[in-house]
Each structure stands twice: as structure tokens, then as C-alpha cells.
Amino acid sequence: MDRMLTFDDYRGIIRALRDPEKGCPWDRVQTHESLKPCMIHEMTEAVAAVDLLSETGDPDNLCEELGDVLLQVVLQSQIAEEEGLFSLDDVIRRAGEKMLRRHPHVFSSEASPEKEEIPGRWEAIKQAEKQGKSAEYERKKKEAEAAAAREVIRLLNAENQ
């Protein structure tokens, strides 16, 4: 490829993959549920790539694996948009708003804390945000964390064989 692809180009690629008539047969039938194992798998590969970067200094694997994680975010967002739930722009907006809220020492007049204090402040802000979340959401989150742990164990076992 001779030209640099932009983020909008990438979004267009994902839309084309999901096109009901011309898209990829595999991508067209994916759902939020069917992609859950892929999301876990790609995150574990990204974590492994971070370890590899630390060990070797070679960034190529991390760059590739972050692209795979990005695919999961954009593909899940595309499916949600098709279902009328939310769009990738909504995901980006909400993620940005969260960063603004959780970094008042950067984005408001609040004094900058010592770096050791930041995780505690982050957690306090997160807990305040959680007040509106349901117990069902928290239960589902714990189930997802357990599924992710099982996938990591499976990958480690496969790697050691």
C-alpha cells in the first residue's frame, strides 16, 4: 500500500467488512457475544507483547497486537451502531470524558498531586462514578474477569506444551 491509512479509512474498512451484501461472510455474522473470546484473546496477546517489548526492546509485536485490540473496539462499536445502540464516536466521547474527570489535576485548577497519590485519587473518582452502576453490572464484570483469567491460563498452558 502506497498511502498512509487514516483512522477514518480504518473505520470504512470495518464497515465494508460488515456490509450485508459485499462484506466478509465471517465478519457479517459476528455479534457482541461471538466476539467475546476474540476480545479476551487479543488482550492477552497484547499483554504478552508488552512483556516481549520489555525483554527485547522490539516494538513490532506490540504494534501489531494493539492493532488487533483496536479491531475489537472498532468492530464491536460498528455492530452496536448497526443495532442502534451507540457509535464509535460515542465510545471515544465517553472515554475522553472519563479521562477528563479522572485527571482533574491536569484538566482543572486542582493542584497536581504527587504521583504516588494519583492511583488512590483515580480509584476514589472511579468509586464515585460507580454509584450509578447496578449490582448486575458488577456481577457481569466479575464473570468477564474470570473468563479472561481462564483464557490467560489456557494460553499459558498451550504455550508451555
Language-model-derived ranges and their functions:
Residues 1-65, 71-161:
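Flexible "arm" and connector segments at domain edges
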